[in-house]
Amino acid sequence: MNILQNLKESDPVISNFIKSEKNRQETHLELIASENFASIAVMEAQGSVLTNKYAEGLPQKRYYGGCEFVDQIEELAIQRAKKLFNANWANVQPHSGAQANAAVFLSLLKPGDTIMGMDLSHGGHLTHGSPVNMSGKWFNAVHYGVNKETSELNFDEIREIALETKPKLIICGYSAYPRTIDFESFRNIADEVGAFLMADIAHIAGLVASKLHPNPIPYCDVVTTTTHKTLRGPRGGLILCKDAEFGKKFDKSVFPGTQGGPLEHIIAAKAVAFGEALQPDFVNYSQQVIKNAKVLASTLINRGIDIVSGGTDNHIVLLDLRSINMTGKIADLLVSEVNITANKNTVPFDPESPFVTSGLRLGTAALTTRGFNENAFAEVGEIIADRLLNPDDSLIESQCKERVLTLCNRFPLYESKLEASIK
């Protein structure tokens, strides 16, 4: 069954859009830190007949008949997730990381309770108490940030804020923090003020699974994550706990609390991705992700572009463009013109608005999936520096784009199987 061929015949307009997107991915350097390239096996699971099945409830406790096979798939996804993160409980049904976080809030909090997370402009996330998100509208959100000198977590300040505000829930885990997170220190603070501790490891889940970043499971009451990004699976969410009995309370907050029927085709794809992440090759991949990020950071620093915190411990490289008198909005446009995809991002203590910003966030997960090594990322760093430091030079712009296309041809995105099915 060639689904894409059927799509071409049934809806050539959508088929052509998909082909165009595939071409864009092949001919651009994907440096958005939250993106990656799922395997063909993961994509096949997503596009399977499982999309036809309703399965409200949990395995063996469904509200619909005919769930014997999706039960087995979901149970396998749960088993693999628990093994991957050394957890005793898992729920694989959340449609996204935001949905996973919402389910946790529903279980542990009441409207008006105080939650404490990192300020969005310092590297936090919308769902950690931003005033534009339900987490900031329904709860009393207080925020901590990073040290102004080091751009790293300041646990003395975090403790002071916690002691003063007495949050019901403390959130650690970020969207633009390039350093290792000390979960044990957060646990100590949470215990001191009597708070629940939640880790949102959406960005670093693959590194945690590979044991290249400390695991929050032993220290946190609950852990949430997405299943794409460094984990390289389908777009979706996941909730994990060390305490199986405590974890059961989140089952009801996922369904019927915040969702209806689970997406069993996505859960199958999650199971495939978890299986891939349990293989030794995935550890090698994760190691390369970090090596590549360090090379990218050092290359840019050597060209006179500041990096927030002076480097990175994970896949994220956050440029502070105030060092070259440029905004993130302009930098994002400049690199996009030479087929590099990134995103403007606030930096700690940013004087610019979130629509302009002083930063550019880069990530190495996607290109590492394509096979990029340290030498390739050194070239990526040089291309970015050449473009940003010469914004008005059309010749350098043209040369940068040629160098990007050379790298794209050197590291093709997918093997011939996908190529043949889309043509």
UniProtKB/Swiss-Prot annotation:
Name of this chain's protein: Serine hydroxymethyltransferase
Keyword terms: Amino-acid biosynthesis, Cytoplasm, One-carbon metabolism, Pyridoxal phosphate, Transferase
HAMAP family: SHMT (MF_00051)
Cofactors required: pyridoxal 5'-phosphate
Recorded superkingdom: Bacteria
InterPro entries hit by this protein: PyrdxlP-dep_Trfase, PyrdxlP-dep_Trfase_major, PyrdxlP-dep_Trfase_small, Ser_HO-MeTrfase, Ser_HO-MeTrfase-like, Ser_HO-MeTrfase_PLP_BS, SHMT-like_dom
Enzyme class: transferase
Positions that bind (6S)-5,6,7,8-tetrahydrofolate: L120, G124, H125, L126, S353, P354, F355
Organism: Prochlorococcus marinus (strain MIT 9301)
